[in-house]
Amino acid sequence: MAGLFPDHPEAIENTAKIAAMCRYDFTFGEIKLPRYRPENGMAPGAYLEKLTYDGLDARIQNGTVVLDTEYPLEVYRERIRYELSVIGQMGYAEYYLIVWDFVHHAKEVGIPVGPGRGSGCGSLVAFLIGITDIDSLRFDLLFERFLNPERVSMPDFDIDFCYNRRDEAIAYVREKYGEDHTAQIITFGTLA
């Protein structure tokens, strides 16, 4: 910095003063999620299960889940039981509900939401509750790429909102869950 601003030694001094005033202790290895409390008073895990089975029924009715000999109802139910078990065991029912909440809200107010991408598309539960629109059974996608007991880092859903209404979706999350529980993360790809 001294090389960039040789005529302004106060810039270096002021930068050092600002750095000295900054104090934040990061707690690594701890996940800090807001709480999701279903309005109906159900426990989060039970509510996620209800949404999942309601979603299965709705998707069968609207034709986005087609039951046949390769994928009968019991195959869907078995996968649901497995996923809900892992989600519950790892303590992520509220995480699913938070993502469901803001995706559901966006769709309700007409904000276009992408169909899903990344490893989150491997979750049948995510499909059935409307976080994604990709049937992981039909496309042989692995739930374990998204969430498994050996995974040490928190999973994340890649959610795409329409660029000109994205701010509305983010404002909803900030308002409902608080500024201190809201962040935006983006990766920029380059050809370099």
Predicted regions and their residues:
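Phosphodiester-processing cores and adjacent nucleic acid-binding clamps
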Residues: 1-192
